[in-house]
């Protein structure tokens, strides 16, 4: 197309004019590249140890640059990777349901919340010392951690199957109605958690609905491992969390790519109508996908409650985490869920650890800002996600 560059005589839309001049695809990409380069240089070279930062109440965190404080850098990097493993466990289930069923399962965080409390109650019931908000790890055997995991996954899988069969199946194809149904389920679950959990409290102590509780890792995980990496010793429990995330990823890959059921699910993600037209009972496939997705939320709840805690309002938090991972990685993509989790983990941990804070706070809230910056960058250049495909 021959373009007349004279002002007032150039035909076409504004977007065509911009494309003709080569602005789109140049300035935004250059700005994104500059931001990424600056972020890397900031962490590696620029940032200072704790002290004044520009006057006033602003100060840097306790971490120096990677060059001047490689040990702290290595610990933050490991924290980011292990947190990403937990994100992947939870978000991969959300991605599976979203990718196949086109259901934005707003109750996914509620599966996590309920699963965490169920695991806590089971572990407390199994241990004669379980009369308080938490057990010490030396009091917990491997079986006393594995049993709550198995019970929690089974209960949440059954609950998820009930939600799918009784509520979602009869509204298949009505995306808005299904989203509203899952919102209703999440509200009901959150209220019931406040009303009934935790059951085990210290003797004589009042019970407040939705108290923060945690379950204990097995005793053998409560030590530090010398990784020979910048002389860093790191928590074995967090390394176990990383190993569990990798194991879940391998298991999902083998299931999705090496079994007939996985092949059908991947076909359903790509083209539900054609899969159904080939004589495959798509309702059974949907049920399997929903059960697996709910089970992964429960699995992640046990791991997350072991490493941290579970409390009311965390359902919304983990739903948001899952949404971010799916938006960044791409809907229905296992590799996208892994990469999205890793990127989110890196952004979350490094921004919280290396950016300035105010007053006596130990960390910053820039992780929230940079999370949305990550979303904006991905949506600007890959609206379908890094590994998603256009319809």
Give short role names for the model-derived ranges.
Residues 72-122, 162-177, 273, 326-335:
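Single transmembrane alpha-helix segments in multi-pass membrane proteins
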Residues 130-185, 192, 339-344, 348, ...:
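Alpha-helical transmembrane segments within multi-pass membrane transporters and channels
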Residues 62-65, 69, 78, 100-162, ...:
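Membrane-embedded helix boundary and interhelical linker motif in transport proteins
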Residues 62-67, 138, 166, 170-174, ...:
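Transmembrane helix-bundle core of multi-pass membrane transporters
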Residues 1-58, 219, 270-277, 281-284, ...:
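Cytosolic-side transmembrane-helix boundaries in multi-pass membrane proteins
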Residues 83, 233-311, 334-340:
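Helix-loop-helix "hairpin" substructures at the membrane interface of multi-pass membrane proteins
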Residues 2-90, 118, 131-149, 174-179, ...:
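Membrane-interfacial amphipathic/re-entrant helices at transmembrane-helix boundaries
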Residues 145-153, 290-297, 301-373:
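Transmembrane alpha-helical segments in multi-pass inner-membrane proteins
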């Amino acid at each position: 197309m021959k373009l007349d560059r004279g002002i007032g005589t150039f035909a076409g839309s504004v977007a065509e004019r911009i494309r003709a001049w080569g602005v789109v695809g140049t300035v935004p990409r250059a700005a994104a590249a500059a931001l990424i380069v600056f972020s890397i240089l900031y962490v590696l070279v620029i940032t200072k140890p704790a002290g004044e930062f520009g006057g006033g109440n602003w100060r840097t965190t306790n971490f120096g640059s990677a060059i001047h404080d490689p040990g702290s850098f290595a610990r933050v990097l490991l924290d980011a990777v292990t947190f990403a493993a937990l994100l992947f466990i939870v978000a991969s289930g959300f991605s599976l349901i979203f990718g196949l069923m086109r259901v934005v399962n707003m109750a996914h965080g509620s599966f996590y919340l309920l699963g965490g409390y169920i695991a806590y109650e089971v572990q407390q019931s199994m241990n004669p010392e379980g009369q308080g908000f938490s057990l010490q790890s030396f009091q917990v055997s491997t079986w006393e951690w594995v049993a709550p995991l198995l019970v929690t996954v089974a209960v949440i899988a059954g609950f998820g199957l009930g939600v799918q069969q009784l509520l979602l199946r009869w509204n298949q194809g009505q995306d808005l109605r299904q989203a509203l149904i899952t919102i209703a389920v999440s509200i009901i679950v959150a209220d019931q958690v406040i009303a009934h959990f935790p059951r085990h409290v210290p003797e004589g102590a009042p019970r407040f609905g939705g108290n923060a509780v945690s379950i204990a890792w097995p005793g053998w995980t409560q030590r530090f491992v010398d990784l020979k990496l910048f002389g860093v010793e790191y928590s074995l429990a967090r390394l176990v969390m990383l190993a569990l995330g990798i194991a879940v990823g391998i298991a999902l890959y083998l299931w999705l790519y090496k079994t007939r059921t996985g092949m059908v699910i991947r076909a359903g993600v790509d083209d539900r109508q054609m899969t159904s037209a080939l004589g495959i009972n798509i309702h059974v496939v949907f049920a399997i996908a929903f059960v697996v997705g709910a089970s992964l939320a429960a699995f992640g709840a046990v791991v997350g409650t072991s490493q941290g805690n579970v409390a009311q309002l965390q359902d919304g938090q983990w739903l948001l985490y899952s949404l971010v991972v799916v938006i960044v990685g791409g809907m229905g993509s296992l590799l996208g869920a892994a990469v999205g989790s890793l990127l989110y983990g890196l952004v979350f941990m490094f921004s919280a650890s290396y950016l300035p804070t105010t007053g006596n706070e130990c960390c910053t809230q820039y992780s929230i800002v940079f999370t949305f910056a990550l979303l904006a960058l991905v949506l600007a250049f890959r609206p379908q996600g890094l590994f998603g495909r256009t319809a």
